[in-house]
Amino acid sequence: MNNLYLGVDIGSVSINIVAIDEENELVFKLYTRNSGNPIELVKEGLAKLREEIELENYKISGVGVTGSGRQLIAYVLGADTVKNEITAHARASTYYHPEAGTIFEIGGQDSKLIIVEDGIAVDFAMNTVCAAGTGSFLDHQAERLGVPIEEFGGLALEADRDVRIAGRCTVFAESDMISKQQYGFTKPEIINGLSEALVRNYMNNLVRNRVLEGEYIFQGGVAANIGIKAAFEEEIGAEVIVPEHHDVMGAIGIAMLAKRDVKRSGQESSFRGFDLTEQEFETTSFECEDCANNCEVIKVIADSKVIAVTGDRCGKWTASLIGDSAANANVEGSSEKEEKTAAKSSKKQDEDLNKNSEELEANLYKVDLEKEKQVMKELEELEKSDENKKEDNSLV
């Protein structure tokens, strides 16, 4: 029986599911829009996986989950590895392109810059505040212009003139595009101007004064837009590589990491199995008022049983899964054995998430302490200078 490893990337706009074998060959790939119910979409994705491959010849030996919605889906699937998108994207990029030094990643709602040295992510930047330049913004503009999103990038290359579009804000960008339309500029010229503006915005907000080296990799859903790719190449003066599976690189990376972690541990996968496609899942929440934190505690319920509790900073409600009816209030039929199993899984996921956060901070953030001390020193000198001025003025 052959081993398969699942990778699931839960984004705000898309949900990606892949399966790789022992040689990291892609056996299954699914890219689907997130319509607002990630649990149901993941269940549908697993059902498609079961339909497309002969499961009697394969065994799911590891499951990894990444993306902004990773916590909930990790509990639902029984994931072995849960990591942030930066780590997952860097893993896949450096596997396919060992010389990768700079990774541009633009998704549906955010954009990322990842700096890689010797196959390891050493620095990164994310823009989660402004939607300008993200996939959802481009979708909206394509719809407004009456252009299929698949043709959006190609039209940019047909522009005869350069048109400057404001790209720092979605509101200003759209207003400027409308203004340029009224002045008679063509759709290709406006789309090309928008592409260049969004790349300028990316460079100003994320790259800033960072030194970009190595191969330049462009991934995420927006990487399919050849207009944006061309704008990046013009901006940096170098070739930009778009991987074959640019749209699911996060899922591929987390699948690879899950395979690594399972082999290191020597334990069986925690995957709940394909039967979960037949289960009904429900999420409920309440505000804990036992301390000043007022945590929003989220419970995940499957077939009338609490399988996970998250959101409590102190771990009180997570721990209450073991032999305590508090977590299972309003839930009937939870056996002690099942509660202990769920609590163990929930605790493991929380530990993994905390560990991942610590690793991210330790490995990706390089805090220049000497510079910080210098800034503090300058502030102290400035304060002393102000005090001396006040004293001099009082003597006059």
Per-segment meaning from a language model:
Residues 35-39, 118-161, 169, 260, ...:
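Glycine-rich phosphate-binding loop plus the immediately following alpha-helix
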Residues 66-69, 197, 208-235, 243-250:
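Glycine-rich phosphate-binding loops at beta-strand->alpha-helix junctions
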Residues 260-331, 335, 350-357:
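Acidic, glycine/GT-rich loop-and beta-edge segments that sit at the periphery of enzyme/chaperone cores
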Residues 91, 135-139, 244-271:
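Glycine-rich phosphate-binding/hydrolytic loop that grips phosphoryl groups
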Residues 2-23, 100-116, 291, 296-300:
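Gly/Thr-rich phosphate-binding beta-strand-loop-beta motif of the actin/hexokinase/Hsp70
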Residues 4-47, 124, 128-129:
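Short glycine-rich, Thr/Ser-proximal phosphate-binding strand/loop in the N-terminal lobe
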Residues 175-204:
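Adenine-nucleotide phosphate-binding core of ATP-dependent small-molecule kinases
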Residues 30-35, 53-86, 122-123:
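Short beta-strand-loop/turn "lid" adjacent to the catalytic site in phosphate-handling enzymes
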